[in-house]
Amino acid sequence: MSQASSTDTPFVIAGRTYGSRLLVGTGKYKDLDETRRAIEASGAEIVTVAVRRTNIGQNPDEPNLLDVIPPDRYTILPNTAGCYDAVEAVRTCRLARELLDGHNLVKLEVLADQKTLFPNVVETLKAAEQLVKDGFDVMVYTSDDPIIARQLAEIGCIAVMPLAGLIGSGLGICNPYNLRIILEEAKVPVLVDAGVGTASDAAIAMELGCEAVLMNTAIAHAKDPVMMAEAMKHAIVAGRLAYLAGRMPRKLYASASSPLDGLID
């Protein structure tokens, strides 16, 4: 998918430029064929994979997800879903690098509990610091706290990914004001991660000025995942164009579209 506009700045992650600003996950689909078709329909170029839950080569006797999303076609973004402390998360990233032949790009997420799946920001900061020291390019799932987002960027994370709502909730953009503060201060790309439920949510995230959006459940749990994937592709482009175009100001009173001056009485 091409850039939204010829005047747009490129979307760059770890030195590589991408045409699509939609990143997608691979979980919760009914089978690998549906996974493949939905990802193709989304136009995504970066696909995230839960290393602890998905076979990407560590189990030779099981179906390998990389047969469906080949690394020569997609940028594989291994993530640490299912990790609840920094030690686990760092170990998982090191395993991913080994399985993917030295691949340094990772998505860090350290969860606080199974009920909310909120990020444990204390453990996230610890893990991020170690991973950056180890030479990883870290994209990091975090809360919508602007201070934590700033600290993660200062540590050396290449992108911060604040939640818009709880993972898998479909609640949409719950706190656009915090996201705006993060975006105003950002010195690295900001991507919404978690909470998107439908195409309008993705468009809103992009209209706020986010560089991109990552989603999984919104597509995989739709009645028609392949169709929703295509809807999300268009929503991302529409939202980015709207952001670049600039929204009209809100007004308390009406303003006629057609002037009355010069009309025949």
Curated annotation (Swiss-Prot):
Active site: K107
Listed GO CC annotations: 2-iminoacetate synthase complex; cytoplasm
GO molecular function: thiazole synthase activity
Principal subcellular localisation of the protein: cytoplasm
Residue positions binding 1-deoxy-D-xylulose 5-phosphate: G168, A194, G195, N216, T217
SUPFAM superfamilies, per database record: ThiG-like
Keywords for the protein's UniProt record, in alphabetical order: Cytoplasm, Schiff base, Thiamine biosynthesis, Transferase
Pathway where this protein functions: Cofactor biosynthesis; thiamine diphosphate biosynthesis
EC nos: 2.8.1.10
GO biological-process terms attached to the record: thiamine biosynthetic process; thiamine diphosphate biosynthetic process
Catalytic reaction annotation: [ThiS sulfur-carrier protein]-C-terminal-Gly-aminoethanethioate + 2-iminoacetate + 1-deoxy-D-xylulose 5-phosphate = [ThiS sulfur-carrier protein]-C-terminal Gly-Gly + 2-[(2R,5Z)-2-carboxy-4-methylthiazol-5(2H)-ylidene]ethyl phosphate + 2 H2O + H(+)
Pfam families the UniProt entry points to: ThiG
Broadest EC class assigned to this enzyme: transferase
UniProt-annotated location(s): Cytoplasm
Similarity comment: family membership: Belongs to the ThiG family.
Function: Catalyzes the rearrangement of 1-deoxy-D-xylulose 5-phosphate (DXP) to produce the thiazole phosphate moiety of thiamine. Sulfur is provided by the thiocarboxylate moiety of the carrier protein ThiS. In vitro, sulfur can be provided by H(2)S.
Subunit details: Homotetramer. Forms heterodimers with either ThiH or ThiS.
Name assigned to this protein: Thiazole synthase
Organism, scientific name: Pseudomonas aeruginosa (strain ATCC 15692 / DSM 22644 / CIP 104116 / JCM 14847 / LMG 12228 / 1C / PRS 101 / PAO1)
Protein's gene: thiG
